[in-house]
């Protein structure tokens, strides 16, 4: 009995001794987190820190708030901020309405090729923004297809479609490009909707409008919030559409950054505008997170 007990104690001691080096050799979790954090800091945070630092560095050198005072006092900045906000809000509203209607049709109105259209929405998300703008220029540009058909049919020297070089052209291009970003989460939400609710509502005499308002819309609100917030942030930072439309007098914050940095070589002012743009984007994203958390989305 004593020999057996001694053997058991010896085995336990050997096991504990073998486990001790293994525990001592175990790498803490924070060590594994260092490489990705370092890569993230080097690739993203360091350039942002340089932009912020440059925004406080006037041409004379040193650190000062003068670049912010000069930019905030300029009419070009105020006009760019106003244009950016109203274009972003208008585009987001248009995308929400159009995206909701199109997603409803694709999800609940059976028609040939409906699944192919839903697949195309996924493909559309990968298109660059300038490609959509280029397509609109081919259709509605000064020498586009619509103006060509008009002049060919009427014999006029010029066509009537010249809105692409106005803010309305930018608005149309942004709605065209960003609407699928609203449709995608809506289609995912509609695919999980219990169709028996629609059947029960219809059997109780509810019309299509009431079914949409009472049954479908409440289920779609989280998806609408997600898609709308994404579109709003992307519209605030959109550069390619405004550049490719060549809209006269349409200067957004990203375009102002380009103008200050590339055309005027005023890097301090460009960094100030960039910091403002980043602050607006981060603020909107934080607000979206708070609202979605309270809504339970």
Predicted regions, residues:
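Transmembrane alpha-helical segments of polytopic membrane transport and secretion proteins
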Residues: 1-34, 109-115, 287-297
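Membrane-water interface segments at the C-terminal ends of transmembrane alpha-helices
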Residues: 28-59, 75-191, 219, 223, ...
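Glycine-rich helix-loop "coupling/hinge" segments at transmembrane-helix boundaries
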Residues: 57-61, 239-265
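Transmembrane helix boundary and interhelical loop/hinge segments in multi-pass membrane proteins
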Residues: 61-64, 142-143, 189-199, 208-210, ...
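A short amphipathic helical element positioned immediately N-terminal to and/or at the very start
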Residues: 63-72
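Glycine/proline-centered hinge or cleavage motifs at structural transition points of membrane proteins
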Residues: 204-206, 218
